[in-house]
Amino acid sequence: MGQKVNPNGIRLGYIRDWRSTWYADSSSYATKLNEDIKVREFLHKKLAAAAVSKIQIERPAQNAKITIHTARPGIVIGKKGEDVEKLRAEVHKLMGIPVQINIEEVRKPEIDAKLVAESVAQQLEKRVMFRRAMKKAMQAAMKSGAKGIKIMVSGRLGGAEIARSEWARDGRVPLQTFRADVDYATAEALTTYGVIGVKVWIYKGEILPGQIAEKKNNKKGAK
């Protein structure tokens, strides 16, 4: 019987990059990994209103470079960059090393799996019918250029006594093609009936070997 694997994890090293990029020996690896987890939790909590998609952490020498991908960069930066400076000071306290924070804008939040999952979860918390929330998200994604989208919600849907899962799909979502650019994310809706889990898969097209090499070269050039 086939088993489903995390679409992001299986594509690491092919068309996906790691979200933490650093090297550590066995004595300090666990400490640094724990630091990364705490920093991500802190930033997601602190920037809950800023629609944060992902946080990338690099550690060149004895420094940390954090890139925050957000759909609302204005909220993160604040007036004249005040908020981002406060944020940098707080993260510096957490990590104990000099920190540089970069902000990258998510141009199309409608085809970002994390932002779509959180949007559906927020609607479920506001008692919007799950089918309506799913349909709205799928229509917006397809209009914004997605090749396919699948959304699954699980829990006590509509306050039902027995928990169940329901899903909907528009277009195609090829999970077994490694070069298929499939963005996957999850979110949780905390409703009065309990927790409802939301999973989102968004297919954006294929990334060919030449494009992967070009992407890596551009990244090296930017550094």
Swiss-Prot record:
Q: Where is the KH type-2 domain?
A: 39-107
- Which cysteines pair up through disulfides? They are none
UniProt cross-references to InterPro entries, sorted A to Z: KH_dom, KH_dom-like_a/b, KH_dom_type_2, KH_sf_prok-type, Ribosomal_S3_C_sf, Ribosomal_uS3_bac-typ, Ribosomal_uS3_C, Ribosomal_uS3_CS
Q: Which UniProt keywords apply?
A: Ribonucleoprotein, Ribosomal protein, RNA-binding, rRNA-binding
From which residue to which does the signal peptide run? none
SMART domains xref list: KH
Gene Ontology terms for molecular function = mRNA binding; rRNA binding; structural constituent of ribosome
Question: Does the keyword Acetylation feature in the UniProt annotation?
Answer: no
GO CC list: cytosolic small ribosomal subunit
This protein's assembly is summarised as:
Part of the 30S ribosomal subunit. Forms a tight complex with proteins S10 and S14.
Give the family, as the similarity comment puts it. Answer: Belongs to the universal ribosomal protein uS3 family.
State its role. Answer: Binds the lower part of the 30S subunit head. Binds mRNA in the 70S ribosome, positioning it for translation.
NCBIfam families named in the record: rpsC_bact
Q: What is this protein called?
A: Small ribosomal subunit protein uS3
From the broadest rank down, the organism's phylogenetic lineage runs:
Bacteria, Pseudomonadati, Pseudomonadota, Gammaproteobacteria, Thiotrichales
